[in-house]
């Protein structure tokens, strides 16, 4: 999604060359370059450290299993967003986390940042109203049950492939 108007004054943006950046939207009224804006979200491969199982959830009446995910608040660190989203959606506390990778998700204009979130006490699990259903899966079964051809599947498969390379 490319913005057509300045987010400060509403003037129609033009295109202007910026050294080292190429063509960038420019506001002639503010005399400022306006770099594209997008959302930022985190998604998590949630792993129970005691069992090695992976949590997949269903949300909003949809039939497919996905990863826990949520938007990053303005000014919030990604690591905090991971812990906050896992706590808000599942009630569980993240013991430690590991950054995996990012991917831009065009349909929602969102930079998705994927992490592995390790929990030590799955008995804390207390899903909020955003979660319709959930299931803990072995890594192989998680791979089989996550929504096919989704960004969640791409993140999960990349994580599992990297883990398998370590063995």
Question: What are the functions of these language-model segments?
Answer:
Residues 11, 22, 28-54, 71:
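Conserved N-terminal beta-strand and adjoining loop/helix that marks the start
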Residues 3-5, 24:
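Residues immediately within or flanking Cys/His clusters that coordinate Zn2+
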Residues 16-24:
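Short linker/helix segments within small regulatory modules
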């Amino acid at each position: 999604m490319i913005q057509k108007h300045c987010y400060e004054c509403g003037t129609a943006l033009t295109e202007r060359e910026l050294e080292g950046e190429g063509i960038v939207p420019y506001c002639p009224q503010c005399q400022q370059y306006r770099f594209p804006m997008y959302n930022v979200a985190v998604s998590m491969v949630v792993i129970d450290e005691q069992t090695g199982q992976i949590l997949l959830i269903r949300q909003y009446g949809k039939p497919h299993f996905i990863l826990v995910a949520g938007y990053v608040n303005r000014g919030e660190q990604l690591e905090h967003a991971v812990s906050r989203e896992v706590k808000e959606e599942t009630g569980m506390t993240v013991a430690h986390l590991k950054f995996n990778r990012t991917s831009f998700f065009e349909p929602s204009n969102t930079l998705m940042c994927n992490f592995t979130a390790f929990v030590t006490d799955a008995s804390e699990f207390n899903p909020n109203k955003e979660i319709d259903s959930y299931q803990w899966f072995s890594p192989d079964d998680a791979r089989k049950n996550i929504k096919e051809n989704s960004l969640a599947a791409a993140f999960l498969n990349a994580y599992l492939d990297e883990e398998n390379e370590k063995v």
